[in-house]
Amino acid sequence: MSRKQLALLEPALVRQALMDAVKKLSPRVQWHNPVMFIVWIGSVVTTALAVAMATGHLAGDAGFTGTISVWLWFTVLFANVAEALAEGRSKAQANSLKGINKTAFARKLREPKYGAQMDHVPADELRKGDVVLVEAGDIIPCDGEVIEGGASVDESAITGESAPVIRESGGDFASVTGGTRILSDWLVVQCSVNPGETFLDRMIAMVEGAQRRKTPNEIALTILLVALTIVFLLATATLWPFSAYGGTAVSVTVLVALLVCLIPTTIGGLLSAIGVAGMSRMLGANVIATSGRAVEAAGDVDVLLLDKTGTITLGNRQASEFLPAPGVDEKTLADAAQLSSLADETPEGRSIVILAKQRFNLRQRDVQSLQATFVPFTAQTRMSGINIQDRMIRKGSVDAIRRHIEANNGHFPPEVDRLVENVARQGATPLVVAEGATVLGVIALKDIVKGGIKERFAQLRKMGIKTVMITGDNRLTAAAIAAEAGVDDFLSEATPEAKLALIRQYQAEGRLVAMTGDGTNDAPALAQADVAVAMNSGTQAAKEAGNMVDLDSNPTKLIEVVHIGKQMLMTRGSLTTFSIANDVAKYFAIIPAAFAATYPQLNALNVMHLHSPASAILSAVIFNALIIVFLIPLALKGVSYKPLTAAAMLRRNLWIYGLGGLVVPFIGIKIIDMLLTVFGLV
């Protein structure tokens, strides 16, 4: 669930934006936008000319020049309003996070375990590595990792989701965020950051920090717009001697009006707002982007690496069956499987313990009473287990257990290979259990592919985006689930090194790669990916490696992130097309008005039959200013997104924004000319 969306033009935001827009009229702000800086200079020049004419220091029509000057100032002001509105929406979203309750004191434990002696200390004195106890009703004082316990946590202040979530030690749900509230039970949390460096602090600082850095595409487009502006500036400058040679020199006011109408002021005025709004839309989707560069990269992504669990499948794999090896009875397998899972905090491990209880009433056992040593799972060994006196029980992937058996001079039965293959062909995950050098059998873990995911992948394929499923399952299981889900490719038995190598392989082919991750073992791949979305419930290392954080911790959000990125790029491209196409109509309005007296043949270009030269020039300038206002909602909201191929999308946008950019100015300028004439304003 996304946090509450702000109304597109909320009155309070508009009022603040208008005040900020006036402040942005300062030349120190305007020179950052070269196109609008030219308009600002034109406004200053025409204002000075109007004052000089009004005071009799210069011959000319002070009323006409003053009116042109006013509308040029409006053009700059409207561009400022667009940017201020976009920034205001982002700041309003960040301000809602400032209101999150923070605790004044924390229970700092002297030892990292429940029941240890504690000291009550100010929360702002906690440092990275400190361990605190939080109980029902407490506000978590720092970002950190749960090292003991489990509790229901209200994260609505951050995610906007009213339903509480479970945070517990072990697994993928061990990360907690400062400012969230414990609803039940207790947690022992190890702080992962120092004061002022929390996730909320960094997020607010990002939104409210210094001026936003332009993205590479934005810089490239700015260079294009500046080049066009220079071309039109030189062209306009040559018109004065050209007209003077013809006998009637064009006034500076008309030349300034012509220049402002020809340069791409529409996209120049909205470009910054589009970028800020893109980050704001990400925040509206509960995704925090560390920079506009990350949002832009999301729009260019053409390979998605998707974790199977939680993204493609529901992610709640449960033990469904014990399949013993030849010569082993099912209860013996269940007994060993349960023992190997007693200290396993993962949902899969707990489901194995429960299944053994249900099938064979195996109860009342724990690691401490058995004087056993738990062997945790690692991405390198790909197995876990337990050592009980002279018994060594392991469970894990087929390859991991095979290596373990061979290392202990044992034999891996071919019958177990067939069991594994049958489980995998059904789309379930096989876990092999062994004791010492003997294979006891296979545990089947069932998962379910999410509804509608196949259709979403088909849409991505139509857009030219390749989907790759990443899973730790064996090749047969991965192939079965990949076929059911409709992904383009898969990486089975994935290790952190394999993920990293796959990303580098795609990047070497010139592709941009996006992925999600939540564990410390995902950090290298997240750091390498072009778009890396870390889960808020994930580890601190994963969050620091990624360039986005999903507050909802929903891996499927990666697809929405790509949609928002593409929408931002489409909006920028569409409004650029519209802005450049606009110039044609303005050309037909101003050129005849400015030069028909010198060259009557140019009257043939007055296809709109505008009332007079003055009304034609003024109509074009007014339209040039007002079109920015009408396009502000589109810049903030983004153009309509449809999952089409690049060629189809280009054709669609050329028809809508290219043809629209040609037709709308002809209609708009003509209507403004008629209104000016009817009301006798020219």
From Swiss-Prot:
Keyword Transmembrane helix included in the entry's annotation: yes
A GO CC term assigned to this protein in UniProt: plasma membrane
Keyword Transport included in the entry's annotation: yes
Positions annotated as active site in the UniProt record: D307 (4-aspartylphosphate intermediate)
Membrane topology: Multi-pass membrane protein
Molecular-function annotations in GO: ATP binding; ATP hydrolysis activity; magnesium ion binding; P-type potassium transmembrane transporter activity
Keywords for the protein's UniProt record, in alphabetical order: ATP-binding, Cell inner membrane, Cell membrane, Ion transport, Magnesium, Membrane, Metal-binding, Nucleotide-binding, Phosphoprotein, Potassium, Potassium transport, Translocase, Transmembrane, Transmembrane helix, Transport
Transmembrane stretches, start-end: 34-54, 62-82, 219-239, 254-274, 588-608, 616-636, 662-682
Binding site for Mg(2+): D518, D522
PROSITE patterns: ATPASE_E1_E2 (PS00154)
Subcellular location: Cell inner membrane
Residues binding ATP, per UniProt: D344, E348, F377, T378, A379, Q380, T381, R382, M383, S384, K395
Catalytic reactions on record: K(+)(out) + ATP + H2O = K(+)(in) + ADP + phosphate + H(+)
EC numbers on record: 7.2.2.6
InterPro entries noted in UniProt: ATPase_P-typ_cyto_dom_N, ATPase_P-typ_P_site, ATPase_P-typ_TM_dom_sf, ATPase_P-typ_transduc_dom_A_sf, HAD-like_sf, HAD_sf, P-type_ATPase_bsu_IA, P_typ_ATPase
Functional description taken from the UniProt entry: Part of the high-affinity ATP-driven potassium transport (or Kdp) system, which catalyzes the hydrolysis of ATP coupled with the electrogenic transport of potassium into the cytoplasm. This subunit is responsible for energy coupling to the transport system and for the release of the potassium ions to the cytoplasm.
Similarity section: Belongs to the cation transport ATPase (P-type) (TC 3.A.3) family. Type IA subfamily.
Subunit structure: The system is composed of three essential subunits: KdpA, KdpB and KdpC.
Identification of the protein by name: Potassium-transporting ATPase ATP-binding subunit
Organism the protein comes from: Enterobacter sp. (strain 638)
Gene name as annotated: kdpB
